[in-house]
From Swiss-Prot:
Belongs to the NHS family. It comes from Homo sapiens. The modification Phosphothreonine is found at T1392. The gene is NHSL1. This is NHS-like protein 1. The modification Phosphoserine is found at S24, S198, S328, S568, S639, S1089, S1167, S1233, S1386, S1388.
Length: 1610
C-alpha cells in the first residue's frame, strides 16, 4: 500500500509531488540535472506523500536546488518505488542515481505510506480508498494527501493536515511568506527538515489521517499545498507552477509573473525546482507524457495530460504568461496561478490585486475552502479551516489545486478539487489566455478583470471567505465571486490569475465563469471570460482548455475538497476524470473550437476554467457548490460537475454557453481521466451522488437524490429557479458536494463518459453509479462531475433545472449528470425523454453499455455523447438512481431530465453545440438545463428567455424553477409549468440560441417562427403546454425578431396559450402512457389545431411530458444543431435559425416536433407549428392523425402550407410513429383512435417513447443533429424533400422542392430538427417543409418514442446486436410489413436507433444495415462521399444504394425497432400502409438512407453504448457526427471540418442553387455523416431536384462515414 499509496499518494500528494515531479519531469528535459534532482526529491517527497508533504513543500520552495536535489534524489527513489506513473518517468532519475539513503527513504516511505494509506482509508469515510485512489493515482490521496501532502509538502509539511494548525500555517507564512527569502531558505530548510518530517511516515500518516478528515470535511487540505502563505504558498506552489509552466516554456512568464516563482525559481532551480514538482506531477498525470507530449497534446490532443498539456502548452502559448505557464501545470495551477498570477498581477499592474490576490489567496483559502469545502461542507472550508489555515488552505488550495490539477492526471486535479487553484491553473490555462487577452487585451481586462479581480477577488475572498456563508448559497446563488472563488481556489492566485490574463479566466472562469455563470459572476465571466474568451480566449482558451482539463481535474479535486469534506477525499479520482476531462476538454476544445471557438474558448477557457475552477469548484467547492461551481464553473464543471449540479449552476451562470461548452469540453476533457476516475467514480457515485444523484443517488445521493428529487420534483420548480437551481445547487450542491463528487464522478464519470462525450458524461453519470463500470466510467463520471456534459450544456438554464435539471437530474442522479445531461444533453434533453425511457427501461443496462460507449464517447466528444446519450440515458437513469428511482413517468420527466443527464449525448452534442455556438449550446444548455427550469413562465419569460435566454437565461432560471419543478414534477401538475419552462429553456436556450440564430431564424421566419417557437414551447412545454406559451412568447419575443413570428406568433400565441393552458392543465397528465399517448389523439386539425392542437399538444405534451426531457434532449440536439447550424451556416441560418429554433423554436418544428411531437407524439407536428401554434399543434395532430389519412391531406396541406409540409411527413411519420408505435406501443396502436387517434396515440406514445428513445436518439443525434444541424440545415431541406417525397411522392416533389427551398430555411431548421431528431426518417420529413420537418420530427419524435420504447432495447444492446445478425433476415422479412416502418423506420427508425433503444438496436442494425448498405452498393460510394463530403456521389447510385440500403437497412432498423418492440411492425403502416408504405418505402428509399443515417447515428450511439461500437461511437460522438469511422478518422475534421464542411457544403448547396441541396447536403453531411449512407440514398431519391442531387451527394458523403462507422462499429 505504501508503494501504491505512495504512488497513489504520490499521485495524489504528488499533486504536489506529482506536480513537482511533473514539473521536474518536464524540466527533466529542460533542466535535466536539477530537474532530475528535484524530480527525485519530489518523487521521494511525493512518494512519501504525507511524509513528503513537508518535503514537497520544500520542493515548492526548493529555491535551492541543492536541498531539493538531495530531497529529490531521495524522493525520487521513493517516488520511483511508489509511483508507477512517475516511476517510469522518474526512472530517468533512476533509483541508481539515488543515494542509498534516498532508496531507504523510499522503502520506508513506501511501507509507511501503505500503512498510512490504509489507515487513511479507514479514517476516510468518504468512500474513497486511499489505496484505490493512490492506485488509481495518488490523486485521491492528493485530495487529502495530494492536496495536502503535495501542497503540504510544498506548502509545508507543517501543514501536514490539510487544514493543519494555524501555527504551522503561520510558520509557513513566516517561512514561506517571504517568498524569496523564506522560499529559498525554507526550501532548504524544508527540504531537509521537511524531509525528516516527511520521512516519518507517522507524520504523513497522521497527515493523511488528518487530511482525510480535513479533506472530507474540507477538501481544502489540498489547499494546504498552498500552505498558509497565501502569497508565498501560492507562490511557492506557484513556484512549482511557474516552474512547471516554465518548464512548459512559460517559466519566464511564470518567473516574471510569479514573484515567488521568480525568486523561488531563481533560488531553487529557477525553473527546475519549481517545474519539477508540478511537471512531475503533471507528467504523472499524463502518465508518461512529457511536457512536449503534453504540450503537443494540449492543443487538441486527447490524452489526459493532453489537457494538462493543453494547460501547459496551450496555456503556455495562450497564456503567454506565467499563467499560461502554470496553467500549463494545472496541478500547480493555483500555485503557479497565484505565483504567476500574482507576479503577473504585479506585472499586469494589479499589484494591489496581487496583494489582494495574496490577500485574496490568503482569505481565499477560506473562501476557497469555503467554496471548495462549501461543496463538502458549505462552510466547511471557511469554518473548517482556521483563518491561517484557511489562508494557507486557500493558498494550499490555490497552490495545491494547481498541483493537484497538474497532478497525475486531472485525477489529482480532480482530486484537488478544492483547489479551485487547480481550476485556476487549469482555468488559468484555459482562460489565462483568454484572460490574458481578455484581461490585457480585452474589455474584460481592466474593468472586468479588475472587477472580477476585485469582485471576484473581493467577493471571492470576502464572499467566499467572508461570504462563504453563501458559499453554497452565495456562490451557489450565482455568486460569481464565490464561484470565482471557487475558481478562486485557484483563484487565490486567481485574482492574480484574474488580474493576470488567467486571472480573468480563473476568476473569470471561477469568478467570472462561475460567478458569471451565476449571474453577476456571469458578468465577470462574461466580461472577463467572455470578453477574454471572445478575444482569443476561445482559441487560447480552447487550447487552454486542456488546461481546462486540468481544471477538470481540479474540479474533481474541488469535488474532493468538498467531497473530501464529505465523503470523497479521494474524490479526486474524479480528478482523474478531470484529467480525462483535460483531455476531454481538449477534445471538447476541438469540438467547441470548431464551432464554438469563442464559445469553445469560453467554454474551454471558462469551461475549462470552469472545469478547473468550476469543475473543481463544483468538484470540491462546487461539490458543495456544484451549482455554484456549475455556476462559477458554469460551464466547465457544469460540464463535469455542473454537469451535475454545476449544470444547474451552469444553467444559471454559464447556463447555456459555458455550461454547454463546458460540457462539451468536459466531455472531451474527462476522457483522459478515465483510469483514475473509477475509484473516484465509485466514491463519486456514493459520495458525489449529487449530480451522480442519478447514479450515486443510491449512496450519498440517495438522500440527496431523494431530497433533491423531491425538491426537484415537487419543489424544484421553486427550488429550481435560479435560486432553486442554486438552491438545489446549494442544497444539492452542498448536500451534493459529495454528490458533486458523485457528480464529479457521475458528472465526471458520467461526464467522463460524457467527457468522452457529453454522453459519456451522461453515461458516466450513470456510470458513476456504476462506479464498477470501471475507470472509464469514473473517468467519464468525472467529466460529468464537470456534462456533461457537456455536461451543463443544458445546465445553465437547465442548471437551475440542472440544479433543476440537475436537481431533477440530481434527484435522478442527473444532478450533475443531469445537468450535464441537461446541459450537456441540452441537446439531448429530448433524448432524456427517450433516454429516460430507455433509462427507465433498462437504465442500468444502458448505463453499463454506455460505459463502454462512454469510453469511446470520451474520445468523440459529441459523438460519444450521442451514443452515450442513449446509453447515458440509461446510464443516467440507473446511475442517477433518480432515473431509476424516478422511473415513474413523472420520473420520466425527471428521468428525462435524468435523460438530460442522458442528454449527455446532448451534452456531447452540446459539446458540439458548444462548438457550434456557445450561445446555442448555452442556449441549448439553458434550454436543456432550463428545459426544466427555464420554462418558468416562459410564456412571459420566453420573451426573456429569448432575449433573456440570449442573456443569461434569466427567465430560464425562473423557468428553471418551474422547469425544475416540471422536470422533476413532470408527473406533477407543476411539470406543465416546467414544460413551459422547459420550453423556455428550449425556447430560451433556443431563443438564446436563437438569439444567434434569430437572425438566421428571420430568414426562416415563416416556418421558423412557427417551427422555432412552436417546438420549444411544444417540446419543452411539458411539453406542449409551456411550449405554446413559450412559443407564442418565444415567437413574439423571438419571433418578433422574426417577421414571421408575428403571425405564427399570433396563431401560436393563440394556440400556444390554449395549448399551454390545456397543457398546463394537462400537466397533471404528464404520464406518457399509452393511454396518454392515445389520448393524445393527434387530430388532423391543422389550422383549428390551435385549440385542438393545443389540446392535442397538451395531450401530447401530457403524454410527452415525460418526453419533455427527450424533447429537451432533442431540442438541445436541435439546439445544438441550431447552434451548429447557426455556427456552420448563417445561410443555414434559416435552418440554423430553424435549428436554433429547433433547439428552441426552429427545432421547434423539428425539435419541437421531435421534442414535442416525438416526445409528444403528435405535438411534434407542432414543431411545424411554423404555420401556427394551432397548426403546430394541429400538425402534431395531423402528423399523428394525418399519418394515416393525412397523407393526402398532408400532401395538400404541405403543398398548400409549406409549414404544413410536415403534414406530408406525417405519413412517413405515421409509419414511423406507427412503427415505433408498433414497437413502442402496439397497444397504443391497438388503442384505436381514429387512425389518427390511433396514430396519434401511437405517435404520441411513440413520440413519447420515441421521445425517450429519440431523446436518446436525439441525444444521439443531437450531435448528429447538431452536426447535422449545421449540415442538417442544408440537409434538412433535402431531407425534408426526401421525406416528403417519400411520404408523399406526389405532393412532395413539387411542394417539397419548393418547400425545401422555403423549408430550406424553415425545413432546414425543421428538417434539421427532424434530422436532428430522426436524422433520416424525421430528417426528410423535416426537410419536407417545416411541416414535413415537423412531421418528420413527429416521426422522429415518434420514432424517438419508439426509441423510448427502445429503453428496453438498450438493455438488449447485445441482444440487438445478436438479433441484428440473427434477425437480419427476419428484419428484412419484417421489412415488408415494416416497409412503411421501413420507410418511416428508415428515416424514423434510424432516428429510433438514434434513440436510446434504437441506438442500441440500431447500432447493430445500422451497423449491419450500414454495412450491408455500404457493402451493397454504396460501400465505396459512401466512403467516397464521406471522404469527399461533397455529395458528389451520383444521384442514381446514391438513390439505388439508398433504396437498396434502405431496404437492407430499413429492415434492420425495423428489426431493431421491432426487435425491441416488434409488436406491430406493420400496424402503424396499417393506418395507411399502402400509401404510407409506398410513400415510406419511397421515402425510405429516398430518405431511408438518411433516416438510416440518423438511424445509423442512433445505432452508432446505441452501438456506442455497446462496447463494440465503443471506438466508433466514441469518435463518432466526438465528431458529433453519427458516422464514427469517419469521425474517428477525422475527429478534428469531424469537429472542425465537419461544421466547416457542412458550412462549405451548405455554401456549395447554395452555390448549386439549391439551398435545399446545400442544406440537405449539409444536413446530410452532418446527418449522413452521422448516418452516412442512409441519408445519401434517402435524400437522393427524395428530392428529384437539387435536393435529390444534394441528398445524393450529401447522403452519399455521410453514407461512407456511416459505413465506416458501421464498419468500425461492426
Amino acid at each position: 500500500m505504501k508503494k501504491e499509496g505512495s504512488s497513489g499518494s504520490f499521485r495524489l500528494q504528488p499533486n504536489t509531488g506529482s506536480l513537482s515531479r511533473a514539473v521536474s519531469w518536464i524540466n527533466f528535459s529542460s533542466l535535466s540535472r536539477q530537474t532530475k534532482r528535484l524530480f527525485r526529491s519530489d518523487g521521494e517527497l511525493s512518494v512519501c506523500g504525507q511524509q513528503v508533504e513537508v518535503d514537497d513543500e520544500n520542493w515548492i520552495y526548493r529555491a535551492q536546488p541543492r536541498k531539493a536535489v538531495s530531497n529529490l534524489d531521495e524522493e525520487s527513489r521513493w517516488t520511483v518505488h511508489y509511483t508507477a506513473p512517475w516511476h517510469q518517468q522518474e526512472n530517468v532519475f533512476l533509483p541508481t542515481t539515488r543515494p542509498p539513503c534516498v532508496e531507504d527513504l523510499h522503502r520506508q516511505a513506501k511501507l509507511n505510506l501503505k500503512s498510512v494509506l490504509r489507515e487513511c482509508d479507514k479514517l476516510r469515510h468518504d468512500g474513497y480508498r486511499s489505496s484505490q485512489y493512490y492506485s488509481q493515482g495518488p490523486t485521491f490521496a492528493a485530495n487529502a494527501s495530494p492536496f495536502c501532502d503535495d501542497y503540504q509538502d510544498e506548502d509545508e509539511e507543517t501543514d501536514q493536515k490539510c487544514s493543519l494548525s494555524s501555527s504551522e500555517e503561520e510558520r509557513f507564512i513566516s517561512i514561506r511568506r517571504p517568498k524569496t527569502p523564506a522560499s529559498s531558505d525554507f526550501s532548504d530548510l524544508n527540504t531537509q527538515t521537511n524531509w525528516t518530517k516527511s520521512l516519518p511516515l507517522p507524520t504523513p500518516e497522521e497527515k493523511m489521517r488528518q487530511q482525510a478528515q480535513t479533506v472530507q470535511a474540507d477538501v481544502v487540505p489540498i489547499n494546504i499545498t498552498a500552505s498558509g502563505t497565501g502569497q508565498d504558498d501560492a507562490d511557492g506552489h506557484s513556484v512549482y507552477t511557474p516552474d512547471h509552466y516554465s518548464t512548459l516554456g512559460r517559466f519566464n512568464s511564470c518567473r516574471s509573473a510569479g514573484q515567488r516563482s521568480e525568486t523561488r525559481d531563481s533560488s531553487c532551480q529557477t525553473e527546475d525546482v519549481k517545474v519539477v514538482p508540478p511537471s512531475m506531477r503533471r507528467i504523472r498525470a499524463q502518465k508518461g507524457q512529457g511536457i512536449a507530449a503534453q504540450m503537443g497534446h494540449f492543443s487538441g490532443s486527447s490524452g489526459n495530460m493532453s489537457v494538462l498539456s493543453d494547460s501547459a502548452g496551450i496555456v503556455f502559448p495562450s497564456r503567454l504568461d506565467s499563467d499560461a505557464g502554470f496553467h500549463s501545470l494545472p496541478r500547480s495551477g493555483a500555485r503557479a496561478n497565484i505565483q504567476s498570477l500574482e507576479p503577473r498581477l504585479g506585472a499586469l499592474g494589479p499589484a494591489g490585486d496581487m496583494n489582494g490576490t495574496f490577500l485574496y489567496q490568503r482569505g481565499h483559502p477560506q473562501a476557497d475552502e469555503n467554496l471548495g469545502h462549501l461543496g463538502g461542507a458549505s462552510g466547511t472550508g471557511t469554518l473548517l479551516r482556521p483563518k491561517s489555515q484557511e489562508l494557507r488552505h486557500f493558498e494550499s488550495e490555490n497552490i495545491m489545486s494547481p498541483a493537484c490539477v497538474v497532478s497525475p492526471h486531472a485525477t489529482y486535479s480532480t482530486s484537488i478539487i478544492p483547489n479551485a487553484t487547480l481550476s485556476s491553473s487549469s482555468e488559468v490555462i484555459a482562460i489565462p489566455t483568454a484572460q490574458s487577452a481578455g484581461q490585457r487585451e480585452s474589455k474584460s481586462s481592466g474593468s472586468s478583470h479588475a472587477r472580477i479581480k476585485s469582485r471576484d477577488h473581493l467577493i471571492s475572498r470576502h464572499a467566499v471567505k467572508g461570504d462563504p456563508q453563501s458559499p453554497g448559497r452565495h456562490w451557489n446563488e450565482g455568486h460569481a465571486t464565490i464561484l470565482s472563488q471557487d475558481l478562486d481556489p485557484h483563484s487565490p492566485g486567481e485574482p492574480a490569475l484574474l488580474s493576470l490574463c488567467d486571472s480573468a479566466v480563473p476568476l473569470n472562469a471561477p469568478a467570472n465563469r462561475e460567478n458569471g455563470s451565476q449571474a453577476m459572476p456571469y458578468n465577470c465571466r462574461n466580461n472577463l471570460a467572455f470578453p477574454a474568451h471572445p478575444q482569443d480566449v476561445d482559441g487560447k482558451s480552447e487550447s487552454s482548455y486542456s488546461g481546462g482539463g486540468g481544471h477538470s481535474s481540479s474540479e474533481p479535486w474541488e469535488y474532493k475538497s468538498s467531497g473530501n469534506g464529505r465523503a470523497s477525499p479521494l474524490k479526486p479520482h474524479l480528478a482523474t476524470p478531470g484529467y480525462s476531462t483535460p483531455t476531454s476538454n481538449m477534445s471538447s476544445c476541438s469540438l467547441d473550437q470548431t464551432s464554438n471557438k469563442e464559445d469553445a474558448g469560453s467554454l474551454y477557457s471558462e469551461d475549462h476554467d470552469g472545469y478547473c475552477a468550476s469543475v473543481h469548484t463544483d468538484s470540491g467547492h462546487g461539490s458543495g457548490n456544484l451549482c455554484n461551481s456549475s455556476d462559477g464553473f458554469g460551464n466547465p464543471r457544469h460540464s463535469v460537475i455542473n454537469v451535475f449540479v454545476g449544470r444547474a449552476q451552469k444553467n444559471q451562470g454559464d447556463r447555456s454557453n459555458y455550461q454547454d461548452k463546458s460540457l462539451s469540453r468536459n466531455i472531451s476533457l474527462k476522457k483522459a481521466k478515465k483510469p483514475p476516475l473509477p475509484p473516484s467514480r465509485t466514491d463519486s457515485l456514493r459520495r458525489i451522488p449529487k449530480k451522480s444523484s442519478q447514479c450515486n443517488g443510491q449512496v450519498l445521493n440517495e438522500s440527496l437524490i431523494a431530497t433533491l428529487q423531491h425538491s426537484l420534483q415537487l419543489s424544484l420548480p421553486g427550488k429550481s429557479g435560479s435560486s432553486p437551481s442554486q438552491s438545489p445547487c446549494s442544497d444539492l450542491e452542498e448536500p451534493w458536494l459529495p454528490r458533486s463528487r458523485s457528480q464529479s464522478t457521475v458528472s465526471a464519470g458520467s461526464s467522463m463518459t460524457s467527457a468522452t462525450t457529453p454522453n459519456v458524461y451522461s453515461l458516466c453519470g450513470a456510470t458513476p453509479s456504476q462506479s464498477d463500470t470501471s475507470s472509464v466510467k469514473s473517468e467519464y463520471t468525472d467529466p460529468w462531475g464537470y456534462y456533461i456534459d457537456y455536461t451543463g450544456m443544458q445546465e445553465d438554464p437547465g442548471n437551475p433545472a440542472g440544479g433543476c435539471s440537475t436537481s431533477s437530474g440530481v434527484p435522478t442522479g442527473n444532478g450533475p449528470v443531469r445537468h450535464v445531461q441537461e446541459g450537456s444533453r441540452a441537446t439531448m434533453p429530448q433524448v432524456p425523454g427517450g433516454s429516460v425511457k430507455p433509462k427507465i427501461m433498462s437504465p442500468e443496462k444502458s448505463h453499463r453499455v454506455i460505459s463502454p460507449s462512454s469510453g469511446y464517447s470520451s474520445q468523440s466528444n459529441t459523438p460519444t455523447a450521442l451514443t452515450p446519450v442513449p446509453v447515458f440515458l440509461k446510464s443516467v437513469s440507473p446511475a442517477n438512481g433518480k432515473g431509476k428511482p424516478k422511473p415513474k413517468v413523472p420520473e420520466r420527466k425527471s428521468s428525462l431530465i435524468s435523460s438530460v443527464s442522458i442528454s449527455s449525448s446532448s451534452t456531447s452534442l452540446s459539446s458540439s453545440t458548444s462548438t457550434e455556438g456557445s450561445g446555442t449550446m448555452k442556449k441549448l444548455d439553458p434550454a436543456v438545463g432550463s428545459p426544466p427550469a427555464p420554462p418558468p413562465p416562459p410564456v412571459p419569460s420566453p420573451p426573456f428567455p429569448c432575449p433573456a435566454d440570449r442573456s443569461p437565461f434569466l427567465p430560464p432560471p425562473p423557468p428553471v424553477t418551474d422547469c425544475s419543478q416540471g422536470s422533476p414534477l413532470p408527473h406533477s401538475p407543476v411539470f406543465p409549468p416546467p414544460p413551459p419552462e422547459a420550453l423556455i429553456p428550449f425556447c430560451s436556450p433556443p431563443d438564446w440560441c436563437l438569439s444567434p440564430p434569430r437572425p438566421a431564424l428571420s430568414p426562416i421566419l415563416p416556418d421558423s417562427p412557427v417551427s422555432l417557437p412552436l417546438p420549444p414551447p411544444l417540446l419543452p412545454s411539458s411539453e406542449p403546454p409551456p411550449a405554446p406559451p413559450l412559443d407564442p412568447k418565444f415567437m413574439k419575443d423571438t419571433r418578433p425578431p422574426f417577421t414571421n413570428s408575428g403571425q405564427p406568433e399570433s396563431s401560436r400565441g393563440s394556440l400556444r396559450p390554449p395549448s399551454t393552458k390545456e397543457e398546463t392543465s394537462r400537466p397533471p397528465m404528464p404520464l406518457i402512457t399509452t393511454e396518454a399517448l392515445q389520448m393524445v389523439q393527434l387530430r388532423p386539425v391543422r389550422k383549428n389545431s390551435g385549440a385542438e392542437a393545443a389540446q392535442l399538444s397538451e395531450r401530447t405534451a401530457q403524454e410527452q411530458r415525460t418526453p419533455v426531457a427527450p424533447q429537451y434532449h432533442l431540442k438541445p440536439s436541435a439546439f445544438l444543431k441550431s447552434r451548429n447550424s447557426t455556427n456552420e451556416m448563417e445561410s443555414e441560418s434559416q435552418p440554423a435559425s430553424v435549428t436554433s429554433s429547433l433547439p428552441t423554436p426552429a427545432k421547434s418544428s423539428s425539435q419541437g416536433d421531435h421534442g414535442s411531437a416525438a416526445e409528444r407524439g403528435g405535438p411534434v407536428s407542432r414543431s411545424p407549428g411554423a404555420p401556427s401554434a394551432g397548426e403546430a399543434e394541429a400538425r402534431p395532430s395531423p402528423s399523428t392523425t394525418p399519418l394515416p389519412d393525412s397523407s393526402p391531406s398532408r400532401k395538400p396541406p404541405p403543398i398548400s402550407k409549406k409549414p404544413k409540409l410536415f403534414l406530408v411527413v406525417p405519413p412517413p411519420q405515421k409509419d414511423f410513429a406507427v412503427e415505433p408505435a408498433e414497437n413502442v406501443s402496439e397497444a397504443l396502436r391497438a388503442v384505436p383512435s381514429p387512425t389518427t387517434g390511433e396514430e396519434g396515440s401511437v405517435h404520441s406514445r411513440e413520440a413519447k417513447e420515441s421521445s425517450a428513445a429519440q431523446a436518446g436518439s436525439h441525444a444521439t443525434h443531437p450531435g448528429t443533429s447538431v452536426l447535422e444541424g449545421g449540415a442538417a440545415g442544408s440537409m434538412s431541406p433535402s431531407r425534408v424533400e426526401a421525406n416528403v417525397p417519400m411520404v408523399q411522392p406526389d405532393v412532395s416533389p413539387a411542394p417539397k422542392q419548393e418547400e425545401p427551398a422555403e423549408n430550406s430555411a424553415d425545413t432546414g431548421g425543421d428538417g434539421e430538427s427532424c434530422l436532428s431528431q430522426q436524422d433520416g426518417a424525421a430528417g426528410v420529413p423535416e426537410t419536407n417543409a417545416a411541416g414535413s420537418s415537423s412531421e418528420a420530427c413527429d416521426f422522429l419524435k415518434e420514432d424517438g418514442n419508439d426509441e423510448v420504447m427502445t429503453p428496453s432495447r438498450p438493455r438488449t444492446t447485445e441482444d440487438l446486436f445478436a438479433a441484428i445478425h440473427r434477425s437480419k433476415r427476419k428484419v428484412l422479412g419484417r421489412r415488408d410489413s415494416d416497409d412503411d416502418h421501413s420507410r418511416n423506420h428508415s428515416p424514423s427508425p434510424p432516428v429510433t436507433p438514434t434513440g436510446a433503444a434504437p441506438s442500441l438496436a440500431s447500432p447493430k442494425q445500422v451497423g449491419s444495415i450500414q454495412r450491408s448498405i455500404r457493402k451493397s452498393s454504396t460501400s465505396s460510394d459512401n466512403f467516397k462521399a464521406l471522404l469527399l463530403k461533397k455529395g458528389s456521389r451520383s444521384d442514381t447510385s446514391a438513390r439505388m444504394s439508398a433504396a437498396e440500403m434502405l431496404k437492407n437497412t430499413d429492415p434492420r432498423f425495423q428489426r431493431s425497432r421491432s426487435e425491441p418492440s416488434p409488436d406491430a411492425p406493420e400496424s402503424p403502416s396499417s393506418c395507411s400502409p399502402s400509401k404510407n408504405r409506398r410513400a415510406q418505402e419511397e421515402w425510405a428509399k429516398n430518405e431511408g438512407l438518411m433516416p438510416r443515417s440518423l438511424s445509423f447515428s442512433g445505432p452508432r450511439y446505441g452501438r456506442s453504448r455497446t462496447p463494440p461500437s465503443a471506438a466508433s461511437s466514441r469518435y463518432s460522438m466526438r465528431n458529433r457526427i453519427q458516422s464514427s469511422p469517419m469521425t474517428v478518422i477525422s475527429e478534428g475534421e469531424g469537429e472542425a471540418v465537419e461544421p466547416v464542411d457542412s458550412i462549405a457544403r451548405g455554401a456549395l448547396g447554395a452555390a448549386e442553387g439549391c439551398s435545399l441541396d446545400g442544406l440537405a447536403r449539409e444536413e446530410m453531411d452532418e446527418g449522413g455523416l452521422l448516418c452516412g449512407e442512409g441519408p445519401a440514398a434517402s435524400l437522393q431519391p427524395q428530392a428529384p431536384g437539387p435536393v435529390d442531387g444534394t441528398a445524393s451527394a450529401e447522403g452519399r458523403e455521410p453514407s461512407p462515414q456511416c459505413g465506416g462507422s458501421l464498419s468500425e462499429e461492426s
